[in-house]
């Protein structure tokens, strides 16, 4: 399972009825190969092992949430609720152990029984297996839904420096990322919104940087975000090594300059551990704003200088392959 996409390899979560059908049909085949009490014991062991193993596999296929990078853990919490997921996995783990205990109990009782009694015991065991699995039917469904949601999370590398590009819509964020990364960027969707995440990459002095545009999250005031989106913004604070905030002083973006600067100030408060670099884009049209840098993505003016500045604002020491250890 990848550290950059910890949920990508999660297997499909079986439903309760699928597990029971699989276990009982294979048990029937196993029983046909033998006769008398041996057939009943074979059916018991086959069904019990399949159910116990498959339920346990549901649990062990998931990564340890506490061992995840903070970005992935917080984003997962925003999407599915980590505490709820832990409880659901705990219930399925209980079911796995319960089936295993029932199998051992009925196996011991069968050994002391005749063939007819063994058949009755096997039927009792199957009924109790079904009761246990059906008790976690809702948990299995919830885990399956969580798996489907989390597999679509963006492939972000917490070990690579990340520059979050923020600002209101139409200020030139995507154009900037496309220009400095030669348009080699990826698009992924947040599962809890209709929003897409744009990620570009570039290398500088042996270091690979991620440039991340988050439309729908960091392009509007905090009060317009819902609870889940606020949690996602919180997750991004763990990821960002610098924030590049673009403003458009020309007014062409459709948003007042005061509103743009208010959003900048809000992000400064949220991302207080990293540098927030304010850049006026479309400087060929207007520079009527107090900014750290001025550039025009359209003409290319000062784009390289802005990129150098935001990279320089990142406190990152590369682990060079030729360094002495």
Where are these regions (language model features)?
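N-terminal accessory targeting/assembly segments
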Residues: 1-92
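Pre-Walker A adenine-sensing motif
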Residues: 145-156
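Switch I (effector-binding) loop of TRAFAC-class P-loop GTPase G-domains
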Residues: 156-158, 179-210, 214-234, 257
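P-loop (Walker A) phosphate-binding loop of NTP-binding proteins
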Residues: 166-169, 179
